[in-house]
Amino acid sequence: MLGRIALPSIFIVLSYGFWASSSFKDLAAGVALFLFGMLCMEQGFKVFSGGTIQRVLSASTDKLWKSLSFGVVSTTLMQSSSLVSVITISFLSAEMIGLAQGIGIIFGANLGTTTGAWIVAGFGLKVNISAYAMPLLVFGVLFLMQSSARFKGLGWILVGIGFLFLGIYFMKNGFSAYAQYIDLTQYAIPGIKGLLVFTLIGIVATVVMQSSHATLTLTITALAAGQLTYENALALAIGANVGTTITAILGSISANISGKRLAAAHLIFNMVTGAVALVMIKPLLHCVEFISGAVGIAADDYTLKLAVFHTLFNVIGVVLMVPFINTMVSWLESHLKGASVEYDQPRYLSEASLELPEVAQQAVYKETLHLFDNAFSLIAHGVDLRRSLVRGDQDLQELLEAPAQPIKIDLDDQYTRMVKDIYSANIEFISRAQAAAPSEFAERFAALRRANMDIVAAIKATKHLRKNLHVYSRGIDKNMRREYNRFRVRVGSVLREIGALREQDDRVVALLSLDRIKVETLDADNHASRIVDKLIRQGEISSQMATSLINDGAYTRELVGRLLDVARDLIQASTPHGEALGDEMSLQIEDIANIARSLDGAALPGEMEDYQ
């Protein structure tokens, strides 16, 4: 409702401004070019983010000072603390960093955003910046026309900087032209009232433009043109700092509880920093005068003094809040808790994660592991095995002769509660992420899609297998009980082996171990088929029992095969970007069948097709 009212209102105001004043055209065009330049730079930096994010994060955020530095450097490069905040929320939602690390990055981003004020005040207003914009645009477009993704990324960055420079130029001209017709300082509000009113204006302007950097640039150019008093400009800078948290809050709406906690930490930091700046405005002004004099800033150079003030109160905010990061983490974790839901929901997927392909891939990889953990319980219970038994070290062969202990479970109900929503969300997320990602991510997203589909197929095979297994594994016929217990042992063994593979850091070893499991599984299939043939020939089971064993043997092969495919796909999806997926290390299906044949004698007709 608010959006439907706000957009037409903005169009009406802008249209009237364009009709009433040519200077307003320059000013509005400057803001538009500046914001568009920021969008172009964001697009360019996203291209360079792929493939190195997790390695950079692990090396750059393992200590608090590194997290702060990461925030400072990334915001200085991107010139957008809002973008850094949203990306950090996506990192946290995907569990690529912890909450304390995320808070450190946010604090650093607030320091990094002060560099924008220095660039505009110290460079943008003192040289003919439009002269630099044109070559940047020309070279940027030239790079954009290349086929290489890296060149395109560089092109977006150069074009973005060019539009930023043009935006500053038009804003400066717009305010200079206004000075000939109207003195905006007549609307200045002195004292505490002025501080509060212009702080609010700064918040609103930042929310509307979704950029504190744009608000500060507008403030500095107005101050340089004499259209804004120094005191009111300080209040606008404070408001811009507080207003930038709105973008982080919006970015956290689709995030999990960790992302929401980080957005809350961002809000707390900026609110505290803004409150301290307002309360201590007089002492801060004295500090600004002292620092300005010490570094040689002229007494009437209010634009550079504004940059000093902006840096000073952000530094004070960081100094005040850093000692309380752990306290803040504890408070946020105790007061912001995930909702208790009847149906399990995705934990790691968020809209913010879609901004960067590698973050999106990591998020859906973790969500697929979450789905598999839920499916693990359903499958184990579906074949009457306790999770603790499967994950333990007891010899599962001991289960062959004893009647199964029934586990009461409604697979349809548990599927709806624990699997369905996560599976649907994963498939949708993969489709959206793959559509926006470069081609080099396609194989890994495809592997994750296959893993999700195989998990669901394994659960469905379990449901079919359970119908007879639930009867025969505890029945009086010892032959049928033993063979159905053999199905249970085979499923439990594969679940246990896959659990061990997840602890294996060496991907090559994991792939070779997976081939070993496949060989053992096919060998067990061959052996089971021979036993069924023997039981039929000797008349120890009825034809109806034999049919059940044959059909349920097929379901067991389907179930085990799907689980092994899931394991393989997850190994491929976890392969670091830029490395080979390791297909050359794996045995082909014919090789596996030949090895199994050598272990168990001549293969039965059709066994290889069954395995496939």
Where are the regions that the model predicts?
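Membrane-interfacial helix-loop connectors
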Residues: 75-80, 84-112, 117-139, 206-243, ...
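Membrane-embedded alpha-helical segments and adjacent helix-loop junctions characteristic
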Residues: 25-88, 148-219
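Transmembrane helix-loop junctions at the membrane interface of multipass transporters and ion channels
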Residues: 9-24, 114-128, 144-146, 176, ...
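Small-residue-rich segments of transmembrane alpha-helices in multi-pass membrane proteins
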Residues: 138, 159-171, 269-278
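Transmembrane alpha-helices
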Residues: 1-33, 132-139, 368
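Juxtamembrane helix-loop transition segments at the membrane interface in multi-pass membrane proteins
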Residues: 44-57, 91-100, 178-184, 218-224, ...
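Cytosolic, long alpha-helical scaffolding segments
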Residues: 97, 123-127, 254, 258, ...
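Alpha-helical transmembrane segments of multi-pass membrane proteins, especially transporters
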Residues: 31-34, 51, 55, 59, ...
